[in-house]
Amino acid sequence: SHFPVTPELPYDYNMDALDSSWQGYFRTFLANRDYDLDISAQTLMKNLRKAYKLPAEWTQEQIYKVISIRYELELRSVPDVGMENYTLATVVSAEDLAAVMELGVPGVIVESGTVREYNTAYAAHLLGELGKLGPDEVDEYLAKGYAMNALVGKSGIEQAFEEYLHGTSGTKYTTVSRSGEVLDQYYTTLPQPGNNVELTIDISLQAVAEDALEKVILDLRENGVGRKKEGKDAEGGAVVVQQCKTGEILACASYPTYNLSTYRNTVAGYNELLEDPYRPFFNRAILAPYPPGSIYKMVTAIAIVDDGGIDPGFIIEDEGLYTRFKSFQPKCHIWSKATGATHGKINLMEAIAYSCNYYFFEAGWQTYNKFRAEAVNPFDTVAKALGLGEPTGVELPEERGTRANAEEKAAQFEGDEAGWYDADVLQAVIG
């Protein structure tokens, strides 16, 4: 039988082990009987039920479970299919283990294996988990020398760094008597451990980010924000904290989330997470493209100064309603017909501080119009240079997102809706 190696552990920024491996008991059934595979599914089920002498009063569910296991055992004993052990149970209690051993069932042996244990309730989306080979993974991993019973990374860091974390499986032979007594065990190939992976994540900061994010989202759902109590429909959110000088990701939180240590404890609990409309398994931090909102004004500000030639001290008077175009007249966020409130005369630095839409409408339009004849979008040029709408280089699967430009719009819409208009420019400059 193939004896899987213990995958090494991902560490956080402070070199604290984020998960560990501990020994659990496995009951394994070794079968070795010839079986005719040239048989229809219906006939197979009928014959197996008779051959296994399953009680007539059993439910269809009970019958299916037992036949599935017994058939798997038979299949594994077929020549050229493989002699991989079949694991009947994992993490068996001492009481159950003793009961099984007392029965002395031939072919049933006990082996110690490794079980991944997570030492933190945080960073579930980042760490990911291990799992058995899926049908679509078997050929790929067998070609790499993996055993059929190998555990591989299924998501997160576990999956992204599988080739580094996973060592080399060993091969162990076990000889048992007819009574089930283990007569001999020996390795022909010793398992070799994999490597550790050091993350830039600071698990303490990650915990602060996740807790704060949860608090904010739940408060939004209950109370909303502002006079209009907006935000009560908040589904989730994300927080990313980077080291400014290096770009290292120190925390990457997504809400809602789940606990890797407990979420599979019960079928009901797991199904509840699967059916949760807020999708706790979805990593919003790197897989969900969102409109940036007013933070995009920083992109516009760079283009205004570097490409538009507008001095940061240039004054524009906020008139509330931007009336340059008859067909589209957006407004500053503090303006309304009832109050007529504006930011008055304002420069670039003040416009950033107060997030004045009007300033960016006017300064942005002047800058865009300067390059109109050249068919150049200065804001898109700056956005691309800053990495927006481009792969970030993070090792986990990510959604690159898009940028607000004529090409992206033409790819997403048809007919008149695919055109790039003055209104699109005004919308783009404020995010």
Predicted regions, residues:
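Membrane-proximal periplasmic segments of bacterial cell-envelope enzymes
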Residues: 1-191, 214-238, 244, 257, ...
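Short beta->alpha linker loops
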Residues: 91-92, 203-204, 355
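A short acidic, often aromatic-flanked loop/helix-cap motif at beta-alpha or helix-coil junctions
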Residues: 116-118, 206, 402-403
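Beta-lactam-recognizing serine transpeptidase/beta-lactamase-like catalytic domain environment
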Residues: 174-192, 201, 231-232, 237-295, ...
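Bateman/CBS regulatory modules and CBS-like beta-alpha motifs in cytosolic regions of diverse proteins
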Residues: 197-206
